[in-house]
Amino acid sequence: MKKKNWIYALIVTLIIIIAIVSMIFFVQTKYGDQSEKGSRSVSNKNNKIHIAIVNEDQPTTYNGKKVELGQAFIKRLANEKNYKFETVTRNVAESGLKNGGYQVMIVIPENFSKLAMQLDAKTPSKISLQYKTAVGQKEEVAKNTEKVVSNVLNDFNKNLVEIYLTSIIDNLHNAQKNVGAIMTREHGVNSKFSNYLLNPINDFPELFTDTLVNSISANKDITKWFQTYNKSLLSANSDTFRVNTDYNVSTLIEKQNSLFDEHNTAMDKMLQDYKSQKDSVELDNYINALKQMDSQIDQQSSMQDTGKEEYKQTVKENLDKLREIIQSQESPFSKGMIEDYRKQLTESLQDELANNKDLQDALNSIKMNNAQFAENLEKQLHDDIVKEPDTDTTFIYNMSKQDFIAAGLNEDEANKYEAIVKEAKRYKNEYNLKKPLAEHINLTDYDNQVAQDTSSLINDGVKVQRTETIKSNDINQLTVATDPHFNFEGDIKINGKKYDIKDQSVQLDTSNKEYKVEVNGVAKLKKDAEKDFLKDKTMHLQLLFGQANRQDEPNDKKTTSVVDVTLNHNLDGRLSKDALSQQLSALSRFDAHYKMYTDTKGREDKPFDNKRLIDMMVDQVINDMESFKDDKVAVLHQIDSMEENSDKLIDDILNNKKNTTKNKEDISKLIDQLENVKKTFAEEPQEPKIDKGKNDEFNTMSSNLDKEISRISEKSTQLLSDTQESKTIADSVSGQLNQLDNNVNKLHATGRALGVRANDLNRQMAKNDKDNELFAKEFKKVLQNSKDGDRQNQALKAFMSNPVQKKNLENVLANNGNTDVISPTLFVLLMYLLSMITAYIFYSYERAKGQMNFIKDDYSSKNHLWNNVITSGVIGTTGLVEGLIVGLIAMNKFHVLAGYRAKFILMVILTMMVFVLINTYLLRQVKSIGMFLMIAALGLYFVAMNNLKAAGQGVTNKISPLSYIDNMFFNYLNAEHPIGLALVILTVLVIIGFVLNMFIKHFKKERLI
């Protein structure tokens, strides 16, 4: 057994040695000629030096212009013929420095443009252009690269000085132009204030004067009116309207006499009718019938008292007899008879269903109909989605919710139709899965085909027509304001003179007091204004008639009118919506078909289950046969319930006695009432006495009334004349009040127009003040720090003379003449291979000798744990010693500078301890699988090394653990990144590896060896 184990150990050792030799050969082949490349670059021309440019500059703004000096620097280098420049990312540049692709990396920092444009700063910061040379270069190559960077930097500084001088000259030129613009704006504001606001305000008091004159005139007319009216009332005689009331006024109407005769005749007729009808009423018959009914009610009441007990006895006897009959009945079906009948019935039904041709034909017909229906439904859904060439309008666009809202639908409707589009997509995917590629279907791409169509407004436009007649004494100007969303074609005629429809102010002929205005033209929507127009869908055209630049005499009291003629056309009806209607109709049709499709989907054509049907029918019959006993018990319970409720039923039937008594009392009262009526009819009615002698008074009263009415008529004629005179005065007052109302309206319109003009002028003046303030603020900043007191600002002068300086990103390594430097890649590879050998030694020892027990387990139960701690400590200490030795050798080989050696040794020790602890744990715990994982990590590292190209790093480099270690050492040796985080991670991994080696679980039966 021991011999066999040593054979296994020997084979594994040979495999490791072969792998190590192969790896060393591969690395030497890949990286060993780096020094040779460096020596050849010395002998070749300078254009063999490759320089990587990393542009991290962010654009800035200076004097309102975008500045990107990083791009300008790159363009400057593009004109350089002696060297090869490439613009790459920082990762690509660092990889190129690592594998020899680039000799120099120049980094343009992100604040390069911002710091370069510090012309206004008092103490500007220097700009640093960072660069780094590759590790391990020859001294001559390094000197050449330094010279290249210095030359490029000097040329770029010269260009920056030219830019600074150009910027200063531009600022002075802009200041000159802005001062002229300020003067022009001030002159325009003053002129507009004089013509647009000051002159109308001077004329404004005239409106108050006209209003005062009209109000005084109206007040005089009203006073005259009231005086005339009072005079008319005072001159009237109060006796004129007094009527003699000694007579009965209610009888003065001439028709009263005839009306009295008519009423008298009607009363006589009514008395005759009453006498004739009372003899025809037969009250005796009604009275006798009611008495007979009362007698019958008495007989019925006596019968109820004697028959109640007989009813109860009869019901009880019948129920007892029925109970005996039911109890004597027995079930005609025995248990055996039921089972035989079940068997025979089952066989009979099976034979009938199996040989029933009609049933089979019906099932086949149903199956064929279902298949045909499904085929037709799929074809209909296909036609609903797919657009046929040229003629088809019933297809579905691939529209979103936002597309529906843009087409004019509200949010609820948009959600509804968006859900239908999703159903169409779902069905499309299901259909394409079942069909070959050539028969696949898709929704039609949407490109605003159903959006609100404004093509007619763009191509044909909308007619603009208006006719208006304006009367005014002081209108002398027309201001036209057009809708900015439209192009207007046509003209405006004012008293026959034509003017184009455009934004303008037109001076009118003041000799005319009436203006006939005719607007006739076409407004076409601008293509670039379509989106703004759809917000309100209205076209506006304003014609404002008013007064401008009026110079009147001081005593001129004419009023000023402002007439606003505005045309607003809502063009919502001109937007085509046919395509939207067709699309919504197509979606609704698809929704209906898809619902039928989902209802029928999943129904499989299963064979008709004859057995289930037969069992159901047989079970129903057998249940009826077996339920005889249960039915018998239920009937007996019903009979018992009827017997219990019989007394209540009889009582309900016989309880009508109370109602009968009440009816008898009502009939007796009715008989008494009819007896009284009969007595009343037997008496003769008394005729009323009517005094007809009063009719003579009507003639005397009418004669006196005629005299009084004649006298009133004369006085009313005089009153009518006075009223007409008052009406004339009232009309005059009304005219004065109307004129006063017009003056007030004109005053209001003029005040409103003046307010609008004042607001416009105020906005313009505020804008001018803002522009002037901005210019003054910006101009104040220009070279405000060019002097420090009375002396020149030396810091700014030094910055502008030499703004950009170079900064060398120093390496940790020291270049010793022509000595080559080993690559960190080979260094990491050697450490990992050494850790694999160490791990295998511990693993082989444990397999041959067993677990290391420094303390016997017999003395304490915790001694096993202490042995594990000591074992992990031995493994970790071995890694520490190996790391210290390897670190000292590598430090001398890399020629690490004095200030960086301690950190370098610490990094190597921690890395070696991680490698040894992790690899030892893998071999001790999972054995062959652990060896596979170790070799896999090594293989990933080889693949990652092979993929390191100037174009960037591959995915393999990101998942390779050894690549991260390689990058850590490379970045440290090049002084690129801090290593604090890396040291913390390595320390954590050392602790994890130490703990894992403490808890090795040994299995009794090992399978993976």
UniProtKB/Swiss-Prot annotation:
Annotated localization: Cell membrane
Source superkingdom: Bacteria
GO cellular-component term (any): plasma membrane
UniProt topology in membrane: Multi-pass membrane protein
Keyword Transmembrane helix: yes
Record key words, sorted: Cell membrane, Membrane, Transmembrane, Transmembrane helix, Virulence
Keyword Cell membrane belongs to the record: yes
TM region positions: 7-27, 822-842, 869-889, 903-923, 928-948, 979-999
Main location: membrane
Subunit structure: Homodimer. Interacts with EssB.
NCBIfam families: T7_esaA_Nterm
Biological role stated in the UniProt entry: Component of the type VII secretion system (Ess). Provides together with EssB and other components such as EssC and EssE a secretion platform across the cytoplasmic membrane in the host.
UniProt similarity note: Belongs to the EsaA family.
Protein's name in the database: Type VII secretion system accessory factor EsaA
Taxonomic placement: Bacteria, Bacillati, Bacillota, Bacilli, Bacillales
Encoding gene (name): esaA
